[in-house]
Amino acid sequence: MANPKAKMSKSRRDKRRAQFNARTKAATTVVCPNCGEPTLPHRACRHCGHYRGRAVVTKSANS
């Protein structure tokens, strides 16, 4: 029976497990309170550029 040659660190083990979880779980979205578009939590809104009630990204008129 095969045995591991060296101990796998917790960091390497968790990196491998994270890849599986990233592929199988759908991304969580929240509704932007400023524009109402779905956006990723803890990120600035990609549509209006607001985060936590402030404009943190300036959006140009043609984008």
Curated annotation (Swiss-Prot):
Compositional bias of kind Basic residues: 7-18
GO cellular component: large ribosomal subunit
Pfam families in the record: Ribosomal_L32p
Calcium among keywords: no
GO MF annotation terms: structural constituent of ribosome
Residues in the signal sequence: none
Region (Disordered): 1-22
UniProt xrefs under InterPro entries: Ribosomal_bL32, Ribosomal_bL32_bact, Ribosomal_zn-bd
GO biological process, one term: translation
Taxonomic superkingdom: Bacteria
PANTHER family: 50S RIBOSOMAL PROTEIN L32, LARGE RIBOSOMAL SUBUNIT PROTEIN BL32
Family according to the record: Belongs to the bacterial ribosomal protein bL32 family.
Record-given protein name: Large ribosomal subunit protein bL32
Biological source species: Chlorobium limicola (strain DSM 245 / NBRC 103803 / 6330)
Lineage: Bacteria, Pseudomonadati, Chlorobiota, Chlorobiia, Chlorobiales
